[in-house]
Design a protein with these regions (language model features):
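Periplasmic N-terminal accessory/gating domains of Gram-negative outer-membrane beta-barrel systems
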Residues: 2-4, 46-49, 75, 103-168, ...
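Short, acidic, small-residue-rich periplasmic hinge/interaction motif at the N-terminus
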Residues: 5-14, 18-42, 70-74, 84-132, ...
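Residue-level recognition of beta-strand termini and adjacent short loop/turns
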Residues: 6-7, 43, 85, 154-156, ...
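Short, acidic Ser/Thr/Gly-rich low-complexity loop/linker segments typical of extracellular
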Residues: 43-55
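Exposed aromatic-hydrophobic patches
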Residues: 55-59, 90-92
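A glycine-anchored, Pro-Gly-centered beta-turn/N-cap motif
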Residues: 61-63
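A short tyrosine-centered beta-strand micro-motif
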Residues: 65-67
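Predominantly transmembrane beta-strands of Gram-negative outer membrane beta-barrel pores used
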Residues: 171, 199-210, 216-224, 232-281, ...
Length: 306
């Protein structure tokens, strides 16, 4: 309640009721969620930032609302409506036109002060696939090994040693679920298929309160939800392994899937070695080591009725 004292009287007023606007911020082309998109109501100045699932929420007083959303690399979007009850509105942003490369050089005298996320690195999937890798096999963990304060030990291994810590001092999460065994083939491959990864957030210090149980670092890996508009697929063949990825809508603009599989053919490399060894050995040795894995994800947006 809101009250006001006038002489000997206390006048009570009912506090104006407020309503909540919530929804998801998505890419209009692929319908994937946009993380850390800005949503602002222009007249009041109140705003919010979308979370890891693209969800936002703002509480406002009833009346005319001008809701604006923006995200790096996308055209801003605005919606005007009358707020009379709790409302759910999804905002779709269109990718902005890409201009030619422009190089801007400058020196910030207080760059260390302006950056509030000390010890945090965001690694998108495009960066993982663009960096050179041993024998052409791209990998999230090997990309993190190139960051300052991180070493990977032996060349080709997928472990992380952050700021002098041990390999067991790191917390790996896949869509919020802990991953305890993070490598294959004695550490030559990590357990994260690059075709399934959307982005990875790497914390070297000042961990958020939601993470715990580790001393050195936290690696939060998020996987692709899949394209809700059209079907896409790709096949990649390397020296040591082959990968395939397929994504697309189950119900258009409502649900999607993303499936990624990979398999190595290291037995083709070890077979000549085993043949040479068996010619000189009394006992026949057999070696056909390989591995395969699969990542599958289904994303569905529920409504008030389903």
């Amino acid at each position: 309640l809101v009250y006001r004292i006038t002489g000997r009287y206390v006048i009570l007023k009912r506090k104006p009721r407020q309503y909540t606007i919530s929804g998801f911020v998505r890419d209009s082309a692929s319908y994937e969620s946009l993380i850390a998109a800005t949503v602002v109501e222009r007249s009041s100045g109140k705003g919010s930032v979308s979370n890891n699932y693209g969800f936002y929420s703002i509480t406002l007083s009833p009346g005319k609302v001008v809701l604006s959303s923006s995200y790096v690399g996308y055209e801003p979007c605005s919606v005007t409506f009358e707020l009379t009850c709790d409302t759910m509105i999804d905002l779709s942003l269109s990718p902005a036109g890409v201009l030619g490369e422009v190089v801007i050089k400058g020196i910030s005298p207080r760059s260390d002060v302006l950056n509030s996320r000390v010890g945090v690195s965001d690694v998108p999937a495009s960066r993982v696939k663009s960096l050179p890798a041993l024998l052409g096999e791209t990998d999230v963990v090997k990309t993190l090994q190139r960051l300052p304060g991180v070493t990977g030990g032996t060349e080709g291994m997928s472990g992380l040693f952050v700021r002098g810590g041990d390999g067991d001092d790191n917390l790996f999460l896949l869509d919020g679920n802990p991953v305890y065994h993070t490598d294959h083939v004695l550490g030559f491959f990590s357990a994260f298929n690059p075709d399934a990864v959307k982005n990875a957030t790497f914390y070297k210090g000042s961990f958020p309160a939601e993470y715990g149980g580790r001393l050195s670092s936290v690696v939060d890996v998020r996987t692709n939800e899949g394209n809700r508009k059209e079907y896409h697929g790709n096949i990649s063949i390397g020296l040591l392994a082959a990968r395939a990825n397929l994504e697309g809508p189950i119900i258009k603009d409502r649900s999607s899937f993303n499936v990624s599989v990979r398999r190595t053919w290291m037995e083709l490399i070890t077979w000549p070695l085993m043949t040479a060894v068996n010619k000189k050995a009394d006992t026949e040795w057999k070696g056909g080591y390989h591995f395969y894995d699969m990542n599958a994800k289904v994303d569905y947006s529920f409504t008030d009725r389903s």
